[in-house]
Swiss-Prot record:
Residues 1-17 form the signal peptide. It comes from the Viruses. This is Protein MGF 110-14L. Keywords: Early protein, Signal. Belongs to the asfivirus MGF 110 family. It holds the Pfam family v110. It comes from African swine fever virus (isolate Portugal/Lis 57/1957).
Length: 121
C-alpha cells in the first residue's frame, strides 16, 4: 500500500512536471518532488534516512542495511525547456541517466547493490 501511495504521489508530481521551472543541479531536490525522483532511481542517497548503517526509505518507509553498498550519491536536474530530467549517479561506475520528465522510466543499473534488512534478496 505504501508503495502504491508513493507511486501515486510521484504521478501527481509528474502531471505537474510541465509546469515546473528548471531545477538546477542539486543533491537535495525539493521535498515536494522526492516521490518523483525516488520512484525512478530509488537508490539515490536523498531518498534515504540512514543511521548506523540502517537506512529507511523516505517515501516507502522500507528498510535496507549496509548503506555503503546499497545507497548511491545522486545529483538531479531538470530542464523545463526540453522537458528532460537527468540523474548523475555515482557508484562503482559513475553514470548519467536521462529521461523525458513527462515519460519517465525506472533506472535499472544498481539494483544489484541493494541489500535488504536481514540479508534477504
Amino acid at each position: 500500500m505504501k508503495v502504491l501511495l508513493g507511486l501515486l504521489l510521484g504521478y501527481s508530481v509528474l502531471i505537474l512536471a510541465h509546469e515546473l521551472p528548471d531545477l538546477p543541479r542539486t543533491q537535495h531536490p525539493p521535498k515536494s518532488e522526492l516521490s518523483y525522483w525516488c520512484t525512478y532511481v530509488p537508490q539515490c542517497d536523498f531518498c534515504w534516512d540512514c543511521q548506523d548503517g540502517i537506512c529507511k526509505n523516505k517515501i516507502t518507509e522500507s528498510r535496507f542495511i549496509d548503506s555503503n553498498h546499497s545507497i548511491v550519491n545522486c545529483r538531479v536536474f531538470r530542464n523545463s525547456m526540453t522537458q528532460s530530467c537527468l540523474y548523475e549517479i555515482s557508484s562503482k561506475m559513475p553514470n548519467h541517466f536521462s529521461m523525458e520528465c513527462l515519460h519517465p522510466r525506472p533506472y535499472t543499473g544498481n539494483e544489484i547493490f541493494m541489500r535488504t534488512w536481514g540479508g534477504g534478496g
